[in-house]
A protein has these predicted regions:
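Short, surface-exposed coil-to-beta transition loops
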Residues: 1-3, 53-57, 78-83
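Hydrophobic pocket/interface hotspot
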Residues: 15-19, 25, 43, 60, ...
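Residue-level preference for beta-strand/loop junctions
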Residues: 39-41, 52, 78, 93
Length: 157
């Protein structure tokens, strides 16, 4: 399981607001292409690894406002579990994020690309959290997501 921590120069409530919905994960997690909300507790994740598309459904198993957010895979061709913990710092003016993420295959040996994807989770999670911190502290978190969506639309045309 990959684990990374980062401190953000924003109040806890603002940081939690940006991280408590998996639909927003592609805004900073470079290896997640898309997340679709199925209902209030269920989300479909989609990513491309090598030549293969991976899809999996997750359920939110813990959502304690401004404290903790967690999910598990319920079906799909890739198993993902994650937990995000939020800790206020400096009388609430800053926030520490503790992010744990794990990927596993449901069956058989992974392809070379999938094995690399799983093996590099910790390093990539650190890069993703650095990107998140920069975007959220600069107030560009939502803007970068819109630009990314526009780029995907243009390349699809």
């Amino acid at each position: 399981m990959a684990h990374q921590s980062i401190e953000v120069n924003l109040p806890l409530a603002k940081v939690y607001e940006c991280l408590n919905s998996p639909v927003d994960f592609p805004r900073f997690m470079r290896r997640i292409d898309k997340v679709n909300k199925i209902n209030s507790q269920t989300y479909e994740f989609v990513t491309q690894i090598g030549d293969d598309e991976y899809k999996w459904m997750t359920n939110i198993i813990d959502d304690l406002r401004n404290t903790r957010f967690a999910w598990i895979t319920i079906n799909g061709n890739l198993n993902q579990t994650g937990t995000i913990r939020f800790t206020p710092l400096n009388n609430g003016s800053r926030t520490r994020i503790d992010f744990s993420l794990d990927y596993r295959t449901f069956f058989g040996e992974p392809t070379e690309e999938l094995n690399e994807f799983i093996t590099n989770t910790e390093e990539q999670l650190g890069k993703d959290l650095d990107f998140f911190r920069e975007a959220v502290e600069n107030g560009t978190f939502k803007e970068q997501s819109e630009e990314k969506a526009e780029e995907k639309e243009q390349t699809a045309v």
